[in-house]
Amino acid sequence: MNVKMLHHVCIQTEKYEESLKFYTEILEFELVKTAVNFHKRDFNTWLRLGTFMIELQTAKKGDKLKDWSSLNEGIVHMCFLVDSVQVEFEKIEKLGYTNFKIKNGEKIYKVEDGYLFKIKAPEGTEIEIRDMLI
């Protein structure tokens, strides 16, 4: 397969307004396009950060989404590489977002040759922010 890039990840949510605010205001994604009443969904929205996109959508009318769990098969979290974990952590904290994952009593923790922290989006998606490639 000759892949050019990872195009997008689709995230479904029953907390659309909260999730949209999280991705645009906390993680600084750009809102590209919103479709209303898209294939039986109230909203289907495209968000972009650099070349990476998220398709944020509500459930189809009449469907009830199950809560996120790290025990599900498939993707467990997504990760963004940054220059400084500390700078990004402080920026998110100053914006008032507090849903950080705690490990060994710490919000930021050392792994291998760098640092990382994890936050939970309103719909449950776990997002890792790290400052080293592997």
Please annotate each region the language model reported.
Residues 2, 89-134:
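Vicinal oxygen chelate
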Residues 12-53, 110:
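Core segments of cupin and vicinal oxygen chelate
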Residues 32-34, 40, 61-67, 102, ...:
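A short, acidic/glycine-rich surface segment
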Residues 41-45, 76, 113-117:
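Short beta-strand micro-motifs in enzyme catalytic cores
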